[in-house]
Amino acid sequence: MKIAVLRERFEGESRVAATPETIAKYIALGAEVAVEKGAGEASRLSDDDFQKAGATIGATAAATLKGADIVLCVRRPAADELGGVNKGALLVGALDPYGNEKDVAALAKAGVAAMSMEFMPRITRAQVMDILSSQANLAGYQAVIEASKVFDRAMPMMMTAAGTVRPAKAFVMGAGVAGLQAIATAKRLGAVVSATDVRAAAGEQVESLGAKFIMTEALKDASGTGGYARELTKDEQAAQAELVAGH
């Protein structure tokens, strides 16, 4: 079985669909792995790193894909970029199908079976394949780091003989995976943190991280199924907007 790892072509995308560590595991299971030249450069992974793990380096996408049974990607490639794969080859990645029905149909027409990993169910057995949680965790961290750069002042309280710098106040909207990581990161940087969420159950998680939980009394609970929030009514949306604006 041949697994192909493509270089990402989406502007600004710095991730790669497999690392030398995971490739070594695929090879140990008996797979052949081909990585497109330069696929890991934006992630600071050289072609030599992949070769040391046992992968072959394809000079072009076509050479990498030739005879592939599985294609790994971060973002969905165009159907015409998948020439040379075996009929019925499996495309695995964050394929973003909603609103891109024509592109998905083109994949089907090309004879490719697509597996969109962002729809992996949130169940215990699938946790190790939950790409949303892992990426949201990083997004929450990065959001605070980027915000601190824009803020351009000290985040923690600083007391010196020359005076006192008061701590920054951080407000996090949403206490899902990304939000909770943002709260934890802001706290570690020394900010005074508060957060809001439409799910009452999120309050305990927010407070466990040392932040203040803010929730409007007009919205009792908007918890839906699978740990997600349900859609708010117009009145609930207005109440939530008023809460945020006044905080």
Label the predicted regions.
Residues E36-K37, T60-A61, A94-D96, S116-P121, ...:
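Short beta->alpha connector loops at strand-helix junctions that form conserved
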